């Protein structure tokens, strides 16, 4: 066998392995989202004041234990979450949207963008006297399919716990 022929054979094998790898990644890839919402008997401005006062999170928030940094589009923040029955995790996302009395949204990535991304949002909608708080996380990227249902369930339970604590804090003022 000549060197050029074995080089072509090796190249063909490598291309085949790469194709199989990409097909597996695509087969395992699945974008996912989790959401929890709650109605709060206070206007959005009252709920916003609590949500935006991130320095007070440790005193009332069972899920987002700490949020450090400025809530301004483009700024990098540090977020420590404590999902129920799990170890705390720290992320450093970039703030995408801040609309007073309406929405906070940030995007975090593990490694490089597109590998494993999480876009988190808090949306406030009003029916006149009450606020509908919608907390949502959209997971996307090549490795999202590796997220276990257990992690998603625990994270959602954390959303619910935070929403309930926020409701209690807002309605008791």
Q: What are the functions of these language-model segments?
A:
Residues 63, 81-83, 97-99, 108-110, ...:
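A mature extracytoplasmic/lumenal domain signature
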Residues 2-72:
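Hydrophobic ligand-binding cavity/cleft-lining segments
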Residues 55-90, 98-99, 103:
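Short beta-edge strand/loop motif at the mouth of beta-sheet-based domains
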Residues 3-12, 132-134, 138-173:
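A conserved amphipathic terminal alpha-helix motif
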Residues 46-51, 57, 77-79, 95, ...:
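Hydrophobic pocket/interface hotspot
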Residues 36-38, 91-97, 108, 118-126:
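Hydrophobic/aromatic beta-strand elements that line small-molecule binding cavities or substrate pockets
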């Amino acid at each position: 066998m000549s060197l050029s022929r074995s080089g072509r054979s090796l190249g063909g094998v490598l291309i085949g392995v790469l194709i199989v790898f990409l097909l597996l990644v695509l087969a395992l890839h699945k974008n996912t989202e989790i959401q929890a919402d709650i109605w709060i008997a206070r206007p959005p401005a009252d709920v916003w004041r609590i949500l935006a006062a991130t320095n007070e999170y440790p005193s009332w928030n069972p899920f987002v234990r700490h949020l450090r940094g400025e809530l301004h589009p483009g700024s990098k923040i540090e977020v420590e979450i404590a999902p129920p029955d799990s170890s705390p995790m720290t992320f450093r996302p970039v703030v995408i949207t801040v609309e007073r009395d309406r929405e906070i949204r940030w995007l975090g990535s593990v490694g490089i963008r597109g590998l494993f991304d999480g876009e988190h949002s808090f949306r406030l909608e009003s029916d006149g006297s009450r606020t509908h708080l919608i907390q949502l996380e959209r997971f996307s990227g090549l490795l999202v399919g590796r997220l276990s249902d257990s992690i998603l369930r625990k994270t959602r339970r954390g959303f619910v716990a935070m929403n309930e604590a926020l409701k209690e804090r807002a309605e008791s003022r």
